[in-house]
Amino acid sequence: MRFILLALAFLGVAPMAEAQQRTRLTVYTALENEQLAPFKQAAEAALRDVEIAWVRDSTGVITARLIAEKANPRADMVWGLSVFSLLQMEAQDMLEPYTPRGAEALRPNMRSARSPMTWTGMDAFVSAICFNTVVAQQRNLPRPTTWQDLLDPRFRGQIVMPNPNSSGTGFLTMVGWIANKGEQGAWEFMNRLHENIQQYTHSGSAPCNNAARGEFGVGLSFDMRSVALKNQGAPIDIIVPTDGVGFDLEATAIMRGTRNLEAAKRLADFTVSRTAAELYGRYYALLALPGVEPTVRGYPAEFAQRLVSANFAEIALARDRLLAEWQRRYDGKSAPR
């Protein structure tokens, strides 16, 4: 009887001891909310002694917070943030140099060129137009095929777009226009587009959600959200403008100054693994790890075919200046925070 009681006591204590031995990693992210639970579950299943504590917000908010905390970092890692943001932090020596195990297999244009690496890519996300076909018929809105088509006066008050200062989607959309038209041409285009914009949101998903609900005819958003809503039956067409679309990389990095460096390195190893890439492939089709078949349904092939060429490092250095100029010109139509 005494042996049974001791055994039961041990079984009760063992899970508690295991929990106490786990290293808690504070991970900053701009992943979509529905990605947080599966990412955490997969990582913690692979790394039994690691616990992930997410800090999640839009790209602009997370980036500003990380930079503000530079002298006293609170994040151990970043998992799922714009490469533009990470390159900006790299220039400020905020990222811990580390080449995750297996990272050499990633596509060369989707990982750090430094040795050791300072960041590793996960996938690419791409700007898209969510076009509500029911609203379009009701309000006599023409189906756009190019960005230029959105300047039609019939779209006045019918377009919502993410604020680039808050949203990585807003920034990559603007970057696409700059790459396509040159900076001066892009500002001229945005001046005219601004006349048709009803509101700038603080989330990259919000414009497509708005369009899917029929609140507006057009939402400028990104591939994952547009495909997900279309698959759920929303009355939207996913339009990939023929004049080219901007894109960004979701990426991962260890923050310099983390007190949990060894655990962070192990999580970084996991983020470049095939298991992680298969997880990314549930949401995106343009993956950093070759040979992994994405499982996301209904992803238009035009996304990969119409990517504009962009110099990530150059744009990262200009990010603050571009965002300040955008703020000066257009912030009057931004949604309340």
Task: Give the location of each predicted region.
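Bacterial N-terminal signal peptides
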Residues: 2-14
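Extracytoplasmic ligand-binding site segments that recognize negatively charged/polar headgroups
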Residues: 22, 30-37, 60, 74-215
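A ligand-binding cleft/hinge motif common to bilobed small-molecule-binding domains
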Residues: 84-88, 212, 216-235
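Periplasmic-binding protein-like
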Residues: 105-109, 125, 189-194, 200-201, ...
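A bilobed periplasmic-binding-protein/Venus flytrap-type ligand-binding module shared by bacterial periplasmic
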Residues: 130-135, 175-178, 249-260, 279-280
